[in-house]
């Protein structure tokens, strides 16, 4: 009975999302993004899950007053809605098309080709985090993106279809071999690493202990690779800026840094991005 109920729920959820995406795909990119952003900013702040975002902001940014906190929450929901509205139009966000994406630090991206060394690109749930692999591939740097496989098989199929042009590997054991194989064969990978990982290590984040995945550090210990931070910012509406920052130094005096040292530096970089544009980060994670 439980399995049947779960299948029915999955079917209703998946079919509902599919119909929404079909409708959004009919609309122009700008309209789809605006519509979902507006709806999300009106409905999202009233949902119970918003309490988690509110508590997170108060926990790590106590200097923000009530008005500023509520503005961050509203902006967060608008950005999340826009991401949903942009999902059916991902291929229209390819760099060079409609001049939607401004790229900075291109020399750091091209280091992969220059040094013939694969990169571990890391980013966060910022602006539209789906843009990174398209920017990289467009500039001749193949990248394998790591994703969390949805429990709902219909939603999983839909997401894989929308990302059909992008090489992907699921998180966990299933994708681990593919990730290592890719790096060893010169193919870069893309990680979104701002979520809590109970099987990770405790690393400071906003000066507070946070369980953090150390997969990035373990990979660069195992396989020679560049570790490149990629910051994605929503400049206005569906216009973005993607910045490839200087590689993180994973060695000191010829000796590899520890996982804790590397991940502390990574968390500091992400924290800097969040403080710069707090309304563009997804505060809904149970990060601390």
Model-flagged regions — what are they?
Residues 95-101, 148, 165-171, 205-207, ...:
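Short, flexible loop segments at the rims of nucleotide/cofactor-binding pockets, characterized by
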């Amino acid at each position: 009975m439980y399995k049947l109920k779960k299948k029915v729920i999955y079917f209703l959820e998946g079919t509902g999302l599919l119909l929404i995406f079909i409708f959004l795909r009919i609309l122009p990119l700008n309209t789809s993004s605006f519509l979902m952003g507006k709806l999300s900013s009106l409905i999202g702040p009233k949902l119970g899950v918003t309490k988690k975002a509110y508590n997170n902001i108060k926990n790590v940014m106590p200097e923000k007053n009530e008005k500023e906190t509520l503005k961050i929450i509203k902006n967060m929901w608008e950005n999340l809605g826009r991401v949903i509205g942009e999902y059916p139009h991902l291929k229209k966000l390819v760099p060079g098309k409609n001049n939607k994406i401004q790229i900075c630090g291109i020399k750091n991206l091209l280091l992969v080709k220059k040094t013939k060394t694969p990169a571990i690109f890391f980013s966060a749930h910022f602006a539209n985090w789906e843009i990174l692999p398209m920017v990289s591939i467009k500039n001749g740097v193949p990248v394998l993106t790591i994703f969390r496989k949805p429990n709902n098989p219909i939603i999983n199929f839909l997401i894989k279809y929308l990302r059909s042009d992008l090489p992907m590997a699921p998180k966990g054991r299933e994708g681990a071999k593919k990730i290592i194989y890719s790096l060893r064969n010169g193919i870069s990978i893309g990680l979104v690493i701002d979520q809590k990982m109970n099987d990770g290590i405790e690393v400071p984040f906003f000066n507070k202990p946070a369980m953090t995945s150390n997969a990035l550090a373990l990979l660069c210990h195992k396989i020679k690779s560049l570790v490149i931070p990629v910051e994605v910012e929503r400049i206005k509406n569906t216009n973005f800026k993607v910045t490839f920052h200087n590689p993180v130094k994973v060695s000191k005096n010829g000796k590899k840094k520890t996982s804790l040292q590397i991940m502390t530096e990574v968390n500091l970089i992400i924290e800097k991005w969040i403080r710069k544009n707090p309304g563009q980060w997804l505060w809904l994670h149970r990060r601390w």
